[in-house]
Amino acid sequence: MITSNRKPIVPDFMRPVAELEGQVEELKKLAPKNDIIINNKIARFQNQLVKLQKEIFSSLTPLQRLHLVRQSERPTTLDYIPGILDEWIELHGDRGGADDPALVGGIGKINGRNIVFIGHQRGRGTKENVARNFGMPAPGGYRKALRLMKHANRFGMPILTFIDTPGAWAGLKAEELGQGEAIAVNLREMFSFEVPIVCTIIGEGGSGGALGIGIGDSILMLEYAIYTVATPEACAAILWKNSKESLAAAEALKITSHDLKVLGIVDEILQEPLGGAQADPYTASQYLKKELTEQLDSLSKLDSQTLKKRRYEKFRRMGAFYEI
């Protein structure tokens, strides 16, 4: 797991939990090993903590979920990979002169099955976030992903993608290098691959930047993750000319896992540990590994033509429209 000495920024709705956790930790430091009174007090505080977490996490608003998945302690692709894969190696470069650190990938084994993995990669702390461009890939990142996916298709290896980005990099240089074209080519090619593709939204799934590695046979989503055409802040600024309307925008956009399951956008919602994946990254990775294994077992029974047909029809069914 990636570690950081940086003090986490706690969202307002999580402050009561953070304060109670702090009290428990202080008591643990002060308590003698066999002090029954203090140990009983610690146990009582821990029970209160669990009750408080259940109360808060059972009623999170869409905007609160967004703030939750933006926490720096949220597990990233490279946090999950060691817990999911038995062995793995990262591969680099798009063979066109770029190696975007905001999008990582490689080959590995999950329960003895060879796979190719690809995922957005955020940083922790200012220095690492700048190096990773805050998880916003440039065109070279999507071309690197495409190279790896073509490798998987050639050698018959399933593809696992992990989505966690506020969006593709929208800088002038990205446009000069063909950001739109790079994402569009990925969409086209992912529909043509003859191997199983399982996409998992592990954090923030933002716009075309998420969709650039988001075409799959199964779309999984962690319980508190979000998936949206635009951030609530951007949507509010566009529609209401006021980013303070982001709460209303988040409600209207239907960004939560439960909303998207009802709408048929995602196939499965994966349970997270109490407190979110950041509270227990290892357990979260094991939940994810179990579901990925089941999905691969199921999809591997289908022939390539059936996979492609189902994948195409799956995305054609999304959304609603009227014919005039």
Swiss-Prot record:
Provide a GO biological process annotation.
fatty acid biosynthetic process
Which residues belong to any copy of the CoA carboxyltransferase C-terminal domain? Answer: 44-298
Report if keyword Lipid metabolism is assigned.
yes
What disulfide bonds does the UniProt entry report for this chain? Answer: none
One Pfam family from the UniProt entry?
A: ACCA
EC number annotated for this UniProt entry: 2.1.3.15
From the Swiss-Prot or TrEMBL record, what is one GO molecular function term? carboxyl- or carbamoyltransferase activity
Q: InterPro entries, per this entry?
A: Acetyl_CoA_COase_a_su (IPR001095), ClpP/crotonase-like_dom_sf (IPR029045), COA_CT_C (IPR011763)
Gene Ontology cellular-component annotations? acetyl-CoA carboxylase complex; chloroplast
Keyword hit for GTP-binding:
no
Q: In which pathway does it act?
A: Lipid metabolism; malonyl-CoA biosynthesis; malonyl-CoA from acetyl-CoA: step 1/1
Q: Where in the cell is it found?
A: Plastid, Chloroplast
Q: Which domain of life is it from?
A: Eukaryota
Looking at its record, which EC class is this enzyme? Answer: transferase
Q: State the reactions this protein catalyses.
A: N(6)-carboxybiotinyl-L-lysyl-[protein] + acetyl-CoA = N(6)-biotinyl-L-lysyl-[protein] + malonyl-CoA
Instruction: Tell me which UniProt keywords the record has, alphabetically.
Output: ATP-binding, Chloroplast, Fatty acid biosynthesis, Fatty acid metabolism, Lipid biosynthesis, Lipid metabolism, Nucleotide-binding, Plastid, Transferase
Q: Which PANTHER family match?
A: ACETYL-COENZYME A CARBOXYLASE CARBOXYL TRANSFERASE SUBUNIT ALPHA (PTHR42853), ACETYL-COENZYME A CARBOXYLASE CARBOXYL TRANSFERASE SUBUNIT ALPHA, CHLOROPLASTIC (PTHR42853:SF3)
Entry similarity comment: Belongs to the AccA family.
Q: How does it assemble?
A: Acetyl-CoA carboxylase is a heterohexamer composed of biotin carboxyl carrier protein (accB), biotin carboxylase (accC) and two subunits each of ACCase subunit alpha (accA) and ACCase subunit beta (accD).
Q: What does this protein do?
A: Component of the acetyl coenzyme A carboxylase (ACC) complex. First, biotin carboxylase catalyzes the carboxylation of biotin on its carrier protein (BCCP) and then the CO(2) group is transferred by the carboxyltransferase to acetyl-CoA to form malonyl-CoA.
State the name under which the record lists this protein: Acetyl-coenzyme A carboxylase carboxyl transferase subunit alpha
Source organism of this protein record: Pyropia yezoensis
